A protein has these predicted regions:
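Hydrophobic membrane-insertion alpha-helices, especially the h-region
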Residues: 6-23
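A structural signal for short, hydrophobic/glycine-enriched beta-strand patches
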Residues: 22-172
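A transmembrane-helix-recognition feature enriched in membrane-embedded lipid enzymes
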Residues: 168-188
Length: 189
């Protein structure tokens, strides 16, 4: 009888914890529209590499004057800045090229979300920056925010999720499990 009660309690605790984590995951994956409307002058736009939609969205925010600087974290070490520019600006617009050349910075050290946070925080401290628009995919955003929040309390993050294929349940589940692992890890440590 006690074993049955213990198992029931454990299962209910897991369900409750999963519900809390799913709720937090859902909240963190949303765009902070209120913060974006109240502030159009951020210290930096930070893009975590992945699909090129993220980098293009970050550059659109730079063009819209949300910030004067954009940092792309986790760029493959063999990719040159001018190669990245050609992908983002395929039509060779002189104005866009000038903006890219002056205001886009790339980091090549990060290999995962945790090292993205470390790389970005290091760059922001070096440049005395505090507020940032964080651009990444909607399902990657919650874990990214956790990594940033748990590696510094000196920056103010406003999120800009880039929509992914929400029909892919496997990708959602993988990212939710990664998020849950990171959340529990930081709660324990």
């Amino acid at each position: 009888m006690q074993l049955k009660t213990l198992l029931t309690t454990i299962i209910l605790a897991i369900i409750f914890l999963s519900f809390l984590l799913l709720n937090e995951f859902n909240l963190l994956s949303k765009k902070n529209d209120r913060e974006l409307k109240n502030n159009t002058n951020f210290d930096s736009i930070v893009v975590l590499t992945g699909k090129f939609d993220r980098i293009k969205k970050g550059f659109e925010l730079l063009e819209a004057n949300y910030s004067k600087k954009m940092f792309i974290s986790g760029v493959n070490p063999i990719v040159k800045k001018n190669e990245l520019r050609k992908i983002i600006i395929p039509n060779n617009s002189t104005e866009k090229i000038s903006l890219f050349d002056c205001c886009v910075f790339i980091g090549k050290e990060a290999k995962n979300t945790k090292t993205n946070a470390v790389e970005v925080i290091k760059w922001m401290k070096k440049n005395n920056l505090i507020s940032v628009i964080l651009v990444t995919s909607d399902i990657h955003l919650p874990r990214s925010i956790l990594e940033f929040q748990n590696n510094t309390n000196h920056i103010k993050i406003t999120s800009w999720p880039v929509k992914t294929n929400s029909n892919n349940f496997i990708n959602f589940l993988k990212e939710f499990l990664r998020f849950s692992f990171v959340r529990i890890k930081y709660l324990i440590l």
